[in-house]
Amino acid sequence: MSLWRQTPDLEQLNASQKNSIGDLLGIRFEAFDDESLTASMPVDSRTHQPFGLLHGGASVVLAESLGSMASYLCVDTSQYYCVGLEVNANHLRGLRSGRVTAVARAIHLGRTTHVWDIRLSGDDGKPSCIARLTMAVVPLAGRAG
């Protein structure tokens, strides 16, 4: 059984990134299945730190962007919206080029919070970062109880 309340439409998800940090960094939603959502980002001058490696903050932006969208797809958006409460990341190895791909899987989907495990890897498939994102599920004013 799928965890998605709304079936992900990758074209629509990518269009939603226009004029946002996701657009600026080249984040693209690429795939989904019943239990995960996948996005990637280029490792280039937009996402490098001064020594030519993928900036840890850029990895966190990818993780939070992916997990936030995953939470959005799990709620009734006519009654709720989701916002980040906490994100942490362990940077495991540096990347210099190519793409970094992130896969988000739910750890907990509660009434008021969602927790996501997000694994990032380089083109070689080796892990580069492990992140955990906690999202608040917030009722729209006057809509949910």
Swiss-Prot record:
One of its GO terms (molecular function) is 1,4-dihydroxy-2-naphthoyl-CoA thioesterase activity. One of its GO terms (cellular component) is cytosol. CDD domains: PaaI_thioesterase. Its EC number is 3.1.2.-. InterPro entries: HotDog_dom_sf, PAAI_dom, Thioestr_dom. Keywords: Hydrolase. Pfam families: 4HBT (PF03061). Disulfide bonds: none annotated. Coiled coil: none annotated. SUPFAM superfamilies: Thioesterase/thiol ester dehydrase-isomerase (SSF54637). It is an enzyme of class 3 (hydrolase). Belongs to the thioesterase PaaI family. This is Putative esterase PA1618. It comes from Pseudomonas aeruginosa (strain ATCC 15692 / DSM 22644 / CIP 104116 / JCM 14847 / LMG 12228 / 1C / PRS 101 / PAO1).
